Amino acid sequence: MHRSLLLKLSALGIIVVLFFGIQTVRWSGEKGAKKAHKHFIQYLSDRRWSKCSRMISELYDDQWKFNRNDISLALRDFGRHFYISLSVDWKTMSATKMKGSHAIKGAMRIEGSGSPAADYIIKEARPYLIDSFTFIWSRSGIMPWSWKLEKIKHPSIKVPPGYVPGDQSSSLKW
């Protein structure tokens, strides 16, 4: 009786070790950063804001002086107008290993529908989408899939004066 229990526990332990070994390989280095980025873009398209927020690092900081909470609210402000559909397409141009992180650079295309402001937002965003975005990702824990977004860079996007992330009255300013 004890021997069969020991064999079952040993088999379970081997399965768990194999699972984590495989996941470590699948989510390591550049592959892991690209995989995390792909999930993030898919969550944006699906308007799953809480999933996006969980992928943003507590230490998030960017050129617009946004922190984790600010960028989460700004994404919601943007997406609030696309309640019928939102499609975010990403084409990776390069992936670069940096000290302790990975930079995923690429082009983004946005389509969608919803409120009357949605068409206006897409029209206003098009000139900015010509330039590439850079997303900086780093591993944040012991789990192989624990990648977090640390920074978003873009050469020409500016935050309009008076824009406050999460303030619905100012969400159309951007």
Residue ranges and their predicted role:
Residues 2, 90, 135-139:
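Solvent-exposed, well-ordered amphipathic alpha-helical segments
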Residues 27, 62-65, 124:
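Charge-dense, low-complexity intrinsically disordered segments
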Residues 2-49, 54-58, 70, 77:
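Short, low-complexity N-terminal intrinsically disordered segments enriched in polar/charged residues
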Residues 97-174:
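Exposed beta-sheet edge and beta->alpha loop/turn motif
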Residues 36, 87-89, 129-131:
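Residues that act as N-cap/strand-start positions at coil-to-secondary-structure junctions
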Residues 50-114:
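Short solvent-exposed beta->alpha transition segments
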